[in-house]
Amino acid sequence: MQVQRQLKRDLDKANRYFNKHFTPPTVSYTVRGRKAGVAYLQQNEIRLNPILLSENSSNFVQQVVPHELAHLLVYQQFGQVQPHGKEWKMMMKEVLGVPAETYHCFDVTNVAGQQFPYRCGCQTHFLSIRRHNAIMQHKRSYICKKCKEILVLKVK
């Protein structure tokens, strides 16, 4: 319910600002992992992470919902532009009245997937299961940005 109320408030702001009627998006709760939310522009849909929402309800609703809605509003108003470009920043600040933040700071302990330790010449890196599997299947290799060495699975 909080999500729908926030969406309505923000849509009302955008409708008044642009003097037009934006189509309300559909909302689903199917995002997994560390992402808080995703906007699907052509489908006019916002997908949210239900675990992060339940663990951070008011902050999540006040930050993530306007963030994703701003992507949809920008697409409807300006077409295809940079995801966090000047139009999106303007939509966040001027229209919706919220800071134009591109990353959330929620605790992702309960949603983070399994991590695999890899080493290089200077440090240990933790890779996702997707990257780990790509390495194991000889489809990909990853290089440390600092020392430029190929990452190797750290044997315990």
Curated annotation (Swiss-Prot):
It comes from Glaesserella parasuis serovar 5 (strain SH0165). The lineage of its organism: Bacteria, Pseudomonadati, Pseudomonadota, Gammaproteobacteria, Pasteurellales. Residues 15-153 form the SprT-like domain. Belongs to the SprT family. This is Protein SprT. One of its GO terms (cellular component) is cytoplasm. NCBIfam families: PRK04860.1. Pfam families: SprT-like, Zn_ribbon_SprT. InterPro entries: SprT-like_domain, SprT_Zn_ribbon, Uncharacterised_SprT.
